[in-house]
């Protein structure tokens, strides 16, 4: 059986089935034509350029609502995490030590594990220049200044919970 596929300029496709000559001539096949057409043409809506096509999603009755919320959605069910530079912590707390907990965060100035390489090196030497510290590091609360100089450590804000940790808001009337 041979098949040919043609795409018409109107956006429809056509598939033809042509029978081959079988060895047994008692079977007769009738060639058929299958024509596919869009149910509705896309509506043209004006956007900033005036040329855009706007398509709507129409859910059929057999679509399964897999989240049990009574909503049908075309969104992917996952959380996107922005890419981070190499060497930057992947946790929300920006801590380089995975063993630290919230109880330890009160004593972070005295904790030598929370100092970065450059800022801990100048504890040993007499060179007390803080020019190497970037403004970005100071804003993000990454640097711990020397306790000997009277510098204050910047407070870190508590990490906000991610979408899996948040409890959904409920209305009390239901």
UniProtKB/Swiss-Prot annotation:
Compositional bias ranges of the Polar residues kind: 1-28
Any one GO MF annotation of this record: protein serine/threonine phosphatase inhibitor activity
Biased composition regions of type Basic residues, renumbered to the chain: 149-159
Location within or outside the cell: Nucleus
Keywords for the protein's UniProt record, in alphabetical order: Nucleus
Pfam families hit by this protein: PPI_Ypi1 (PF07491)
Biased composition (Basic and acidic residues): 123-142
Compositional bias (Acidic residues): 94-109
InterPro entries registered for this protein in UniProt: PPI_Ypi1
GO CC term (a single one): nucleus
Region Disordered: start-end pairs: 1-72, 84-174
Known function: Regulator of type 1 phosphatases which maintains protein phosphatase activity under strict control.
Record family assignment: Belongs to the YPI1 family.
Annotated protein name in UniProt: Type 1 phosphatases regulator ypi1
Gene encoding the protein: ypi1
């Amino acid at each position: 059986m041979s098949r040919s596929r043609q795409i018409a300029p109107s956006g429809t496709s056509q598939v033809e089935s042509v029978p081959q000559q079988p060895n047994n001539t008692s079977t007769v096949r009738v060639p058929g034509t299958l024509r596919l057409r869009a149910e509705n043409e896309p509506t043209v809506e004006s956007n900033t350029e005036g040329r855009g096509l706007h398509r709507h999603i129409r859910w059929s009755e057999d679509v399964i609502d897999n989240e049990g919320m009574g909503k049908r959605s075309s969104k992917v069910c996952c959380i996107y995490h922005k890419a981070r530079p190499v060497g930057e912590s992947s946790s929300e707390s920006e801590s380089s030590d995975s063993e630290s907990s919230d109880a330890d965060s009160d004593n972070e100035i005295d904790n030598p594990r929370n100092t970065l390489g450059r800022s801990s090196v100048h504890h040993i030497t007499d060179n007390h220049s803080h020019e190497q510290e970037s403004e970005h590091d100071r804003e993000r609360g990454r640097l711990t200044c020397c306790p000997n100089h009277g510098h204050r450590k910047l407070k870190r804000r508590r990490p906000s919970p991610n979408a899996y940790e948040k409890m959904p808001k409920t209305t009390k009337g239901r």
